[in-house]
Regions:
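Conserved catalytic or regulatory cores that recognize and/or transform ribose-phosphate-containing ligands
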Residues: 1-146
Length: 146
């Protein structure tokens, strides 16, 4: 007699989202230099009927929460883990901007490792495209870009 396999946490979450009839959840990824573009992407995704989660802190802008270097380092680690949780929660990722740095590249790899679809506002910077060496070395200018 065979026993049913227990659900993985991912399967349980997917089932719960379906039973709750939740809209698709999109996580916005990208360099915090693109916070304004992330806000625009949030607006567009929300208007399209999707739930949006995105970075909530721009540590490149001065703020009392990260003015102490030691505290800032610990906060950055917590925020990175929080963003990975947002990626796990989401149904898909949207990468904003025409530049992919190390952190964003790691987020893309993590989302793909989890089997999440990944969209780009600037597909030319997709690190999954064979032979594309333009990411991570600076901004990429595209006709569809800024």
């Amino acid at each position: 007699m065979s026993h049913p396999q227990p659900l993985t946490p991912e399967q349980a979450l997917a089932g719960a989202k379906k039973r709750l009839e939740l809209p698709r959840i999109v996580v916005i990824c990208g360099s915090t230099r693109f916070m304004a573009e992330m806000a625009e992407a949030d607006l567009r995704e929300t208007a399209a009927g999707r739930i949006v989660v995105k970075p909530g802190c721009d540590m490149k802008s001065p703020h009392a929460l990260w003015s102490d270097p030691a505290g800032a380092e610990a906060l950055k680690a917590r925020l990175d883990e929080l963003h990975r949780a947002k990626i796990r929660l989401a149904d898909e990722a949207l990468v904003v901007g025409d530049y992919i740095g190390d952190s964003t590249r790691a987020e893309i790899a993590y989302a793909r490792e989890l089997g999440k679809p990944v969209r780009f506002t600037h597909p030319v910077v997709d690190p999954g495209v064979a032979g594309d060496r333009r990411h991570g070395d600076g901004p990429v200018t595209t006709r569809a870009g800024r």
